[in-house]
Amino acid sequence: MNAEKSPENHNVDHEEIAKFEAVASRWWDLEGEFKPLHRINPLRLGYIAERAGGLFGKKVLDVGCGGGILAESMAREGATVTGLDMGFEPLQVAKLHALESGIQVDYVQETVEEHAAKHAGQYDVVTCMEMLEHVPDPQSVVRACAQLVKPGGDVFFSTLNRNGKSWLMAVVGAEYILRMVPKGTHDVKKFIKPAELLGWVDQTSLKERHITGLHYNPLTNTFKLGPGVDVNYMLHTQNK
């Protein structure tokens, strides 16, 4: 990776990338560090497909795709998918798994800002799941996603709210007590309040369409979507 930062690739946190590089080989281990992502993926996919009016035949960009869990599932729905990430090892894992699965996904190592400079207005759907809290300038990512989607196209974001409950649930609970994700995965200071995200959206051509919470029940070990955005939440926006 080129250490010299251009205006387009300034928005990279190399410490964050290193965290995911270190565990990339276990991305598709259903009982490993990424088990929660595998568990919530059907909920994410269903929400995206329903709100976007289906994915079949659509051109989709998955920003911060990692090892390709969501990207592959959207390709299985009949979408033409491009996966974007700055982590070399996660992308290698994603490419190999897609090859083994017979799934066609185009994986690219570059920032969303770089991609937007070359592919503005080319996508029907853009997804950005659990990525905003891992970059220095999340507002820049929101702007780039808005630039990439076609008029009338859909952009989806998911992230974590910043408050005491989300710290208890996502950091103390998930990392230290339940050990659902590796310690150090999250930094509560980088979590994003819905009002902040909506404020960034309002400064682009995107318009809020729907917001929902993603809830975990430790007693039943299940996830569900529903009202309440105090911890994890997903936002559906549409280009005006």
From Swiss-Prot:
Its EC number is 2.1.1.222, 2.1.1.64. It catalyses: a 3-demethylubiquinol + S-adenosyl-L-methionine = a ubiquinol + S-adenosyl-L-homocysteine + H(+); a 3-(all-trans-polyprenyl)benzene-1,2-diol + S-adenosyl-L-methionine = a 2-methoxy-6-(all-trans-polyprenyl)phenol + S-adenosyl-L-homocysteine + H(+). InterPro entries: SAM-dependent_MTases_sf (IPR029063), UbiG_MeTrfase (IPR010233). One of its GO terms (biological process) is methylation. It holds the Pfam family Methyltransf_23. The keyword Transferase applies. Signal peptide: none annotated. It comes from the Bacteria. S-adenosyl-L-methionine binds at R44, G64, D85, M129. Keywords: Methyltransferase, S-adenosyl-L-methionine, Transferase, Ubiquinone biosynthesis. Gene3D superfamilies: Vaccinia Virus protein VP39. Disulfide bonds: none annotated. The keyword Transferase applies. It is an enzyme of class 2 (transferase). One of its GO terms (molecular function) is 3-demethylubiquinol 3-O-methyltransferase activity. Pathway: Cofactor biosynthesis; ubiquinone biosynthesis. PANTHER family: METHYLTRANSFERASE, UBIQUINONE BIOSYNTHESIS O-METHYLTRANSFERASE, MITOCHONDRIAL. Belongs to the methyltransferase superfamily. UbiG/COQ3 family. O-methyltransferase that catalyzes the 2 O-methylation steps in the ubiquinone biosynthetic pathway. This is Ubiquinone biosynthesis O-methyltransferase.
